[in-house]
Design a protein with these regions (language model features):
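Conserved beta-strand in the GNAT
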Residues: 36, 42-50, 55-62
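Short amphipathic alpha-helix that is part of the acyltransferase structural core
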Residues: 1-25, 38, 134-136, 140
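C-terminal "cap" of GNAT-fold acetyltransferases
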Residues: 116-141
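Conserved GNAT acetyl-CoA-binding A-motif
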Residues: 82-98
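Conserved acetyl-CoA-binding loop-helix of GNAT-fold acetyltransferases
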Residues: 63, 69-82, 94
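Conserved active-site alpha-helix within GNAT-family acetyltransferase domains
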Residues: 97-123
Length: 141
């Protein structure tokens, strides 16, 4: 299964909603990129990047429930990290309410919300969509 850029917003929103992740801020944007993989023409996994120069927000990681525990989430994150690094991103940030252990296993560490770069603080994910109780994490590439 190959991972590639995707831009079909309805398909992206459908998988995010099925995984109970926010969709209200998904719209065409130069700074928001999505990558995904399909199986039998069905989107089964996605990950997003909001890129702001040397920092980026890793977001919207979603895997079809029937495809979980098969390494797809890790593959999507690895792909997103490599793509971000190829664009000059030095630090990736993320917010999660349920997957902090998963991301810790991939090298992400807890980060201070107060010390978040202003570009990250200004994202809709940071400023409103994700609750204050979300784990805020960072990985330096």
């Amino acid at each position: 299964m190959s991972i590639e850029p995707i831009d079909r917003l309805a398909e992206i929103k459908q998988l995010l909603a099925a995984c109970e992740l926010p969709t209200t801020d998904i719209s065409p944007s130069k700074s928001l990129l999505f990558f995904g993989c399909h199986s039998d023409a069905k989107l089964v996994g996605i990950v997003g990047l909001e890129i702001y120069g040397t920092v980026a927000l890793l977001r919207s990681l979603a895997v079809d429930p029937a495809r979980r525990k098969q390494g797809l989430g890790k593959s999507l994150v690895d792909f997103a990290e490599a793509h971000a690094a190829s664009l000059g991103v030095e630090s990736l940030y993320l917010l999660t309410t349920t997957a902090d252990a998963f991301f810790s296993g991939l090298g992400y560490s807890p980060a201070s919300r107060e010390e978040a770069p202003s570009f990250i603080k200004n994202t809709s994910q940071f400023s409103g969509l994700c609750p204050a109780s979300s784990a805020f994490m960072c990985k330096h590439l």
